[in-house]
């Protein structure tokens, strides 16, 4: 009953946001580097924040420093969706938020170099998640797979967080997918959505890694990770400015050049990541070897795909 109520409230909150976005003209206009062709409401992913907030309010204010951190990144990302903000301003908010999350993790009790590594990894993951949000369904669908995996791990492998937190966030992702995981999306996640859900997943995976002392759990993000890193390397080889928008991710080639429906491409990413997670859980004793093998296999697939189809790319 609790989750049904949460679903209904989040659904109503999303509908209310649509009215606000429509009235305030918070929209995404297509351009030559977009993978969509129609004007669409932007920022629907703000519902992820409300999902986390709902858990915070109903759990006796659990994880207050994390919620404050999520509020910071949600705020600056939402502002960026409305009007472009300066890079230094975004970095200030993001680094402040990560410091709060690290404090919630208890990371400051470890050696300083762990904090440096965590800062680099977290910054990379947040940016990668943001870059990968380019077609209908991919952010919501991929996040749903990871959250489902985390829920299973939390129940069957090791308890690293209160289960209600994961399930409440899942409710928010389901609401978003209802409006986005379709041929003609009602809304896009926006930076507020892609950065927000990335931050939530980082918090959960970080707790899992710290609780187990096993970094190989990062395999939960392997599909996004390989696509993002190899695309950056590819663009550097092409002497491009990696800070500028582009359409060179593997999923973008599939959707734009090969004309594969967005929902189909998103489903492929979901299925591949789900298979990887199932395999990892089955062979958990060989975690790091499995992670290395997964990265190598995904990299080979990426390279072969690009060798065959990148010639079709126009921008």
Task: Label every model-predicted segment.
Residues 75, 175, 274-279, 299-302:
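Aromatic-anchored segments of alpha-helical transmembrane domains
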Residues 76, 87-97, 290-315:
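Alpha-helical transmembrane segments and their immediate juxtamembrane interface regions
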Residues 278-295:
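Extracellular/periplasmic helix-loop-helix junctions in multi-pass membrane proteins
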Residues 15-41, 232-263:
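Cytosolic, membrane-interface loops and tails of multi-pass inner-membrane proteins
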Residues 86-89, 190, 222, 260-268, ...:
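Membrane-interface starts of transmembrane alpha-helices
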Residues 19-24, 183, 236, 303-315:
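Membrane-interface capping segments at transmembrane-helix boundaries
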Residues 1-229:
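"…together with the soluble PPM/PP2C metallo-phosphatase catalytic core" -> "…together
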Residues 169, 261-278:
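Hydrophobic membrane-spanning alpha-helices of multi-pass integral membrane proteins
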């Amino acid at each position: 009953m609790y989750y049904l109520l949460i679903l209904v409230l989040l659904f109503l909150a999303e509908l209310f946001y649509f009215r606000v976005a429509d009235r305030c003209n918070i929209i995404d206009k297509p351009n030559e580097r977009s993978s969509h062709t129609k004007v669409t409401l932007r920022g629907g992913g703000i519902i992820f924040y409300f999902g986390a907030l709902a858990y915070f309010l109903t759990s006796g204010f659990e994880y207050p420093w994390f919620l404050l951190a999520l509020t910071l990144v949600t705020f600056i990302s939402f502002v960026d969706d409305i009007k472009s903000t300066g890079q230094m301003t975004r970095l200030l908010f993001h680094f402040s938020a990560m410091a709060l999350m690290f404090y919630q993790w208890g990371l400051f009790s470890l050696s300083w170099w762990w904090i440096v590594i965590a800062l680099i990894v977290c910054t990379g993951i947040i940016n990668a998640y943001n870059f990968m949000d380019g077609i209908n369904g991919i952010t919501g669908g991929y996040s749903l797979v990871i959250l489902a995996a985390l829920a299973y791990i939390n129940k069957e492998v090791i308890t690293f967080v209160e289960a209600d937190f994961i399930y409440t966030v899942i409710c928010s992702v389901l609401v978003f997918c209802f409006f986005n995981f379709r041929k003609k999306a009602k809304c896009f996640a926006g930076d507020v959505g892609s950065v927000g859900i990335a931050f939530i997943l980082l918090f959960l995976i970080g707790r899992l890694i710290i609780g187990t002392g096993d970094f190989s759990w990062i395999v939960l993000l392997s599909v996004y990770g390989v696509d993002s890193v190899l695309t950056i390397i590819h663009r550097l080889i092409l002497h491009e400015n990696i800070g500028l928008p582009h359409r060179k991710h593997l999923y973008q080639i599939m959707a734009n050049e090969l004309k594969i429906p967005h929902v189909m491409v998103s489903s492929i990413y979901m299925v591949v990541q789900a298979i990887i997670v199932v395999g990892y859980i089955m062979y958990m004793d060989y975690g790091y070897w499995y992670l290395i093998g997964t990265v190598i296999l995904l990299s080979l697939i990426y390279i072969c795909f690009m060798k065959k189809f990148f010639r079709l790319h126009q921008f």
